[in-house]
């Protein structure tokens, strides 16, 4: 009798009702890493401004260049007038100022430095516009069908969009 009561008590205590997940964000995705299975989605393909999440693609292309041997951490990057004109978060590079790739990467990662993101982009591709073409090409290769980049740092620009789904990829 005690075993039956204990079992019934355990069942009562362990019974939990599932309720819907409430997410206040306009869109969200929870994706299993190995299989890509979507476990939760809310407006996952809604196109939104990516802001500084853009810098993840800038960092990816920079790291791929390092891995590919076309760029080294010790290489020097010179700040152009265009890179120095960025608004938002920055380290206030001065025109002609030179930092190593390593220093620029740290500034992008720690400070979210727009000026350094653009300086790296220009260093790698000759211009921010040419680098953005690379960003969009790489996004397409990754299957990021909701994403269009317009700049290397994430400052607002018409048509500069991505989705929660694409970010999850």
State the predicted function of each range.
Residues 1-4:
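Positively charged n-region of N-terminal signal peptides that target proteins for export
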Residues 7-15:
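Bacterial N-terminal signal peptides
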Residues 18-165:
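Active-site-adjacent loops and short helices of periplasmic peptidoglycan-processing enzymes
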Residues 168:
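Acidic, His- and aromatic-enriched active-site or binding-groove loops in soluble protein domains
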């Amino acid at each position: 009798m005690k075993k039956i009561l204990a079992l019934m008590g355990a069942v009562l205590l362990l019974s939990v009702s599932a309720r819907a997940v409430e997410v206040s964000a306009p869109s969200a995705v929870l994706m299993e890493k190995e299989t890509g299975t979507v476990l939760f989605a809310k407006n996952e393909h809604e196109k939104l401004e990516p802001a500084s999440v853009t810098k993840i693609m800038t960092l990816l292309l920079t790291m791929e260049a390092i891995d590919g041997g076309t760029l080294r951490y010790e290489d020097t990057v010179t700040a152009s007038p265009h890179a120095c004109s960025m608004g938002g978060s920055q380290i206030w590079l001065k025109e002609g100022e030179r930092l190593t790739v390593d220093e620029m990467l740290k500034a992008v990662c720690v400070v979210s430095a727009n000026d350094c993101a653009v300086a790296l982009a220009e260093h790698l591709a000759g211009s921010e516009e040419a680098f953005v073409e690379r960003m969009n090409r790489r996004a397409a290769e990754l299957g990021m069908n909701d994403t269009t980049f317009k700049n290397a740092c994430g400052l607002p620009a018409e048509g500069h969009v991505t989705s929660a789904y694409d970010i999850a990829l």
